[in-house]
Amino acid sequence: MKNDDEQSSLILAVIGIIPVIWFALLVAPYLSSGLMGILEGVPEAMNHPFSIQLCGDSVKTVLIFLLAYGMGIGIYLSTKKHYRRGEEHGSAKWGNVKKINRRYREKRFTKNKLLTMHVRISYNMRKHLRNVLTVVIGGSGSGKTRFFAKPNLMQANTSFVVLDPKGENLRDTGYLLEEKGYEVRVLDLINMEKSHCYNPFVYLKDDNDVQRLVTNLFKATTPKGSQSNDPFWDTAASMLLLALIFYLRYEAPEEEQNFPMVMEMLRAGEVREDDDQYQSPLDELFERLEMKNPEHIAVKYYKDYHSGSAKTLKSIQITLAARLEKFNLSSLAALTATDDLDLPSLGERKVALFALIPDNDTSYNFLVSILYTQLFQQLFYLADHKYGGRLPVVHFLMDEFANVSLPDDFDKILSVMRSREVSVSIILQNLAQLKALFEKQWESIMGNCDEFLYLGGNEQGTHKYVSELLGKATIDTNTYGKSTGHSGNYSTNYQNTGRELMTPDEVRMLDNRYAILFIRGERPILDEKFDILKHPNVGFTTDGNGKPYLHGAVDRAVASISLGDSLEGELTDDALESEDYELLSDEDLEEIIQKYV
């Protein structure tokens, strides 16, 4: 802005030379008559401004006037002051709600993301040059679900991925979404028998995806704040898991590529501490694979794992079994045996995927963490290879964001999301949660999101952060003085000072009807929270007396351990119908392997 002002001043100064020369030429004929002649001639010259007469003094007069003009410009510039009246201590003020809304909204109401009652933003990022990544912070009871999550689901204008503690959003808006033509899919970790199935193996496109899956699984199953004194055991356990997954990926039929089968293989890998030469059925399986293909990636990882003593191998297996112990539960084994979610379809069809998690138990949240990571990769791949880098919009509503482990480079993932037309709403109770999750990257995450919506709360650090974002304003103050005595008098002094637009304690006292909204490049907005009862689609939801959405069970079956189609001939019909299984003896296994190979 300063450079623009200097450029404008320079242009005006150059333009000013023209009238100076013109006036000098008008005065030149009177120069020889002295000062009195000039004073008498100027009115005459001004009465006939276009009667310019060149004379011997014309050049000299022009030079004198230009010199005087230049000196005047120099004096002006040397004494020029930069005043910002009324902004001496800060220029913060509230933004105009109507003007800001007009800049960012689509005229059609349902084409927008709802932020407050009177401010909405288009999903078309090229319209306003802002991303549609939003951080929403509000304490318990501030209306994160009612005033933000549900109204945006009711828009029914994107594909949705919703982290839904307690299943409230699904119950209240699922019927509406189906009425609007959505396929509603549910990963239900509260009542797993009602859940659609999710098998992470289905979305492994290459070896790098396998590495990501194992890395994310170990990170997501590590308790918050815990640190391992010896990372050897986790590293070795991850090598064993990689060996098992790679074996299933390249050697097993599709129906056996899942975590329940990983658990079967792990249980088949018996280790006898008193017998280093003992070969378990799992050892023999990998030995046969090595004979077939010594360079097989599963063999490489298995040999790396198997290079220790029997006691060490036993400890490694126990470490891995502890990481995967949840898959021993029949409910989770059934849920992960097959896949119904069809993740890539979120970028191509109207799909609403709800991940229901208990609000009082984080035991199974690691599965949502894996789901998020695979979703990001699937959508990015689809955007790059089918849609030229820009997907039809997918909106991640990440309620209770702090309850799910995410990759350490989530701040970089946010940057990639913006360019792929993926919208994210990170919903937190306070800023401390984000700092705890991403101690070093939390500021980068906040900076990557062009919208920040504050709904109220009681966390002091958040109050201070919001107050600092609002900035300082310049206000007028006055002081009064009084002197007593024989000639006493009163005096009043007026002056300017600065104060925060809202101090931290004023932020804490924010009326529960209002929210504070920040949009990058705009003044802060104080506006009412969105009234869900005024949404045109409220009649399809339970808030508008619509019927609740009830999701049912999905047929599925857990695969049994098998080494090939020929195995079926060894089993009776009764055995095939039974869900029970048992590990075969070494002799039986050897006989079957010989037939299979």
Predicted regions and their residues:
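Basic- and hydrophobic-enriched, low-structure N-terminal and domain-boundary segments
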Residues: M1-S142, R146-P151, T484, Y494, ...
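Polar low-complexity intrinsically disordered regions enriched in Ser/Thr and small residues
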Residues: P19, G37, H89, K93, ...
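Extended hydrophobic/Leu-rich segments
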Residues: L35-M46, F109, S483-S487, T503, ...
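Short alpha-helical interface patches
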Residues: H48, V59-N112, D207-L217, M261-A268, ...
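A broad, low-specificity signal for short, low-complexity segments enriched in glycine/proline
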Residues: K93-N101, N112, T116-R126, R146-F147, ...
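P-loop NTPase motor domains
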Residues: R130-V422, L437-Q441, G447, T497, ...
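Conserved ATP-driven motor cores of ASCE-family P-loop NTPases powering translocation/secretion/packaging/pilus
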Residues: L414-I516
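Short, surface-exposed polybasic-aromatic patches that bind anionic ligands, especially phosphate groups
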Residues: F530-D531
